[in-house]
């Protein structure tokens, strides 16, 4: 229930906030899998005052690292949006065909789709550099953050529930 709640940080990204003792200001650290972290000082109305720090990842880019890409596809029901992340080889050529490796975790509570920026991605970048496209898809049933029906989709079928969504997602890419 969000009635009466006003979001302070509305930028697209995963946010971590820490209010200062006075509660007049807070530090908002946010990023996305495809966007480096921003560390901002904001007032208690959400207005940005100062960028406090900016990470320097130039060496990673020079070494051939590429940001993964976010995507949205439909679930096997052809109604529900599924969010995913894709890692491509550094020398990706859109005219070529690549084998796909899909990271699937049919476990409870949270899936394996990263939402924050990281250079350590459970070997997805390394597999991409071997010539694969690697994807991670947020299957129905993997998170309670999208409501009870979405979260309980795999109830009683922990092993197989994400496979239909995963197959359908790959077919759409």
Regions found by a protein language model. Give the residues of each.
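Serine-hydrolase catalytic core recognition
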Residues: 9, 16-173
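Blade-edge beta-strand/turn elements of extracellular beta-propeller
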Residues: 2-10
């Amino acid at each position: 229930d969000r009635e009466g709640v006003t979001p302070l940080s509305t930028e697209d990204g995963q946010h971590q906030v820490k209010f200062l003792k006075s509660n007049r200001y807070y530090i908002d650290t946010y990023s996305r899998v495809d966007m480096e972290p921003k560390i901002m000082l904001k007032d208690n109305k959400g207005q940005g005052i100062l960028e406090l720090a900016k990470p320097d990842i130039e060496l990673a880019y020079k070494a051939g690292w590429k940001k993964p890409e976010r995507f949205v596809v439909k679930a096997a029901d052809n109604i529900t949006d599924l969010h995913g992340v894709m890692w491509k080889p550094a020398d990706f050529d859109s005219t070529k065909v690549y084998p796909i490796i899909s990271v699937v975790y049919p476990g409870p509570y949270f899936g394996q789709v990263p939402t924050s920026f990281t250079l350590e991605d459970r070997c997805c970048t390394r597999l991409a550099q071997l010539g694969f496209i690697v994807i991670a898809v947020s299957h129905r049933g993997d998170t309670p953050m999208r409501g009870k029906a979405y979260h309980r989709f795999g109830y009683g079928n922990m092993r197989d529930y994400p496979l239909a969504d995963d197959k359908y997602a790959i077919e759409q890419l």
